[in-house]
Amino acid sequence: MATPLGWSQGGSGSVCLAFDQLRDVIESQEELIHQLRNVMVLQDENFVSKEEFQEVEKKLVDEKAAHAKTKALLAKEEEKLQFALGEVEVLSKQLEKEKMAFEKALSSVKSRVLQESSKKDQLITKCNEIESHIIKQEDILNGKENEIKELQQVISQQRQSFRNHMSDFRIQKQQETYMAQVLDQKHKKTSGTRRARSRQCSREK
């Protein structure tokens, strides 16, 4: 029979890893918001059109909303994990006490069986009830462990979804930057052509 306290220590390590993953997601979102702000400032300095500025501003607002929603959801999942871990810890301690009581009772039963054969059946029945109760407690602990694993899987899926979203957003930003460079080069080329024509007209006059 596995020792619940040993299991609890391993479970805590897994949960700590899950919490680190949550923090990574939040930090990534905050970094994205910071980058969007920098993009807005840079575009403002380069005389970006009002439509482009409003589009970037809207994206920033949307990212802030998504960040807040994700942060709230992760906080809720973290609360569930903490609650589940608290229950596991309480049940583990209770199970340990009951196991000690069971071992003590079993030792007492063995001594009394030798001394009081008439009470043997009654004492054995009591021990069986205690053992059955311990088995039920272990089943509850296993259920809590499965619940924690499911919560960790949800967190992992949310993190992967966020990474995919960030990848799509970066690709979009690269495309927008490329288009802006093309338009800027085209604008400079058009301006140079107009100046050349203007000088030629002045010479002809």
From Swiss-Prot:
Region Required for interaction with CBX5 and TBPL1, residue ranges: 138-185
Keywords: Coiled coil, Cytoplasm, Developmental protein, Differentiation, DNA-binding, Nucleus, Spermatogenesis, Transcription, Transcription regulation
InterPro entries, per the entry: SPATA24
Tissue: Highly expressed in the testis and is mainly localized in the spermatids. Also expressed in the lung, heart, spleen and epididymis.
Ranges for region Disordered: 182-205
Compartment(s) of residence: Cytoplasm; Nucleus, Nucleolus; Nucleus, Nucleoplasm
Principal location listed in the UniProt entry: cytoplasm
Segments of skewed composition (Basic residues): 186-205
Keyword Cytoplasm listed: yes
UniProt record, GO biological process: cell differentiation; spermatogenesis
Cystine connections: none
Coiled-coil residue spans: 17-166
GO cellular component: cytoplasm; cytosol; male germ cell nucleus; nucleolus; nucleoplasm; nucleus
Example of a GO MF term: DNA binding
Subunit structure: Homodimer. Interacts with CBX3, CBX5, GMNN, GTF2B, TBPL1 and the polycomb proteins PHCF2, RNF2 and SCMH1 but not with CBX1 or PCGF2.
Function according to Swiss-Prot or TrEMBL: Binds DNA with high affinity but does not bind to TATA boxes. Synergises with GMNN and TBP in activation of TATA box-containing promoters and with GMNN and TBPL1 in activation of the NF1 TATA-less promoter. May play a role in cytoplasm movement and removal during spermiogenesis.
Family per similarity comment: Belongs to the SPATA24 family.
Protein name stated in the entry: Spermatogenesis-associated protein 24
Originating organism: Rattus norvegicus
Gene: Spata24
